[in-house]
Amino acid sequence: MQAIIQLRGPVNMSGAVEDTLAMLNLHRVNHCALVPETETYRGMITKVNEYVAHGEPSVEVLSTVLERRVESENSDETVDETWLEAHTEYDDFDALATALIEEETTLRDQGLSPVLRLHPPRGGHRGQKHPTAEGGQIGVHDTDQINELLEAMR
């Protein structure tokens, strides 16, 4: 499972990239989507690589982000562990995060919004417009790097 975070806005973005971001449920900057690791999604991520940060997060960090940022798909109810127990197959955020990483379920299957609306990173971006190879935030991240970014945006 990959976490994809849109970091750049729509200025000078081609229509094909904009459509691909929409297919990934990324409509605004600082939104995050969780997608399975399939060939189709790999191609989509490659196409939008200059506008997003992506990588596989750890269970602990994903659990923290879900606890703070997950929303119900159909209502304005606050999602907490009580809500999770009553409306999903999982008792807590750790179990949900584990199932998401192992690709056993999706947020939408559990009645949750497929988009996590994140806070801008505390402390700012490290060279937002540059690829990770040049010390920036755009592109592929290893687990530690994506965890650091998600923690800053929790």
Curated annotation (Swiss-Prot):
CDD domains: Ribosomal_L7_archeal_euk (cd01657). InterPro entries: Ribo_uL30_ferredoxin-like_sf (IPR036919), Ribosomal_uL30 (IPR039699), Ribosomal_uL30_arc (IPR005997), Ribosomal_uL30_euk_arc (IPR035808), Ribosomal_uL30_ferredoxin-like (IPR016082). GO terms for molecular function: RNA binding; structural constituent of ribosome. The keyword Ribonucleoprotein applies. The keyword Repeat does not apply. Pfam families: Ribosomal_L30. Residues 114-139 are annotated as: Disordered. Signal peptide: none annotated. Keywords: Ribonucleoprotein, Ribosomal protein. One of its GO terms (biological process) is translation. One of its GO terms (cellular component) is cytosolic large ribosomal subunit. Residues 119-129 have a biased composition (Basic residues). Belongs to the universal ribosomal protein uL30 family. Part of the 50S ribosomal subunit. This is Large ribosomal subunit protein uL30. The lineage of its organism: Archaea, Methanobacteriati, Methanobacteriota, Stenosarchaea group, Halobacteria. The gene is rpl30.
